[in-house]
Amino acid sequence: TLREALETTKIHSVAGKLKEVGLMNQRPFRSPHHTISNVALVGGGSYPQPGEISMAHNGVLFLDELPEFKRDVLEVMRQPLEDREVTISRAKFTVTYPSSFMLVASMNPSPSGFFNDPSAPQTSSPHEMQRYLSKISGPLLDRIDIHIEVTPVPFEKLSDDRKAESSVDIRQRV
């Protein structure tokens, strides 16, 4: 909507990240590296700037390899996920930025990345897997609505010579 485009544009303008386009008409997609700091994620500084969660407002915040993020960095997202805004307080003033974003996260169920892969050796012990997964707190997991396990598909199954259905056939079916 126009209201969402204006909100998103304002946030990017305040952060000094507004491209030469006057109005942002595409939803933001933000994908910070797992080494990000608390301040870079939620915002801050002596004059509080928006962080990644506000830069993702009205869009998607994608966290790849979720357990690789520091636990305290993940925990600072809990309240903004709940409230859809983040408040940054400093000695002289307080700033509130919107942070209504869709959180999408990916992760392997083990540090080796090969759990449930029949073609790879299992290199992580159950204890290592538990320690790896425990980096993500229950309260944060509660704020993630959909959990999907994707099992490995052998390359041969993806690349075999089966004939694909034509667009004409699909159109007739629909």
Segment roles from a protein language model:
Residues T1-K19, D83:
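Walker A/P-loop
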Residues R3, V21-L23, V73:
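Inter-lobe coupling/hinge segments of SF2-like helicase ATPases
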Residues E20-G43, Y47:
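Inter-Walker segment of RecA-like/P-loop motor cores
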Residues Q26-R30, P48-Q49, I53-N58, I88-P109, ...:
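AAA+/SF3 P-loop NTPase mechanochemical coupling elements
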Residues P32-S37, Q49-E82, G113-P118, S137-R143, ...:
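Conserved AAA+/SF3 P-loop NTPase catalytic/coupling segment centered on the Walker-B
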Residues V42-Y47, R84-S89, H127-R131:
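Short gly/ser/thr-rich secondary-structure transition/capping motifs
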Residues V95-S100, S110-V174:
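Phosphate-sensing "switch" segment of ASCE/P-loop ATPases
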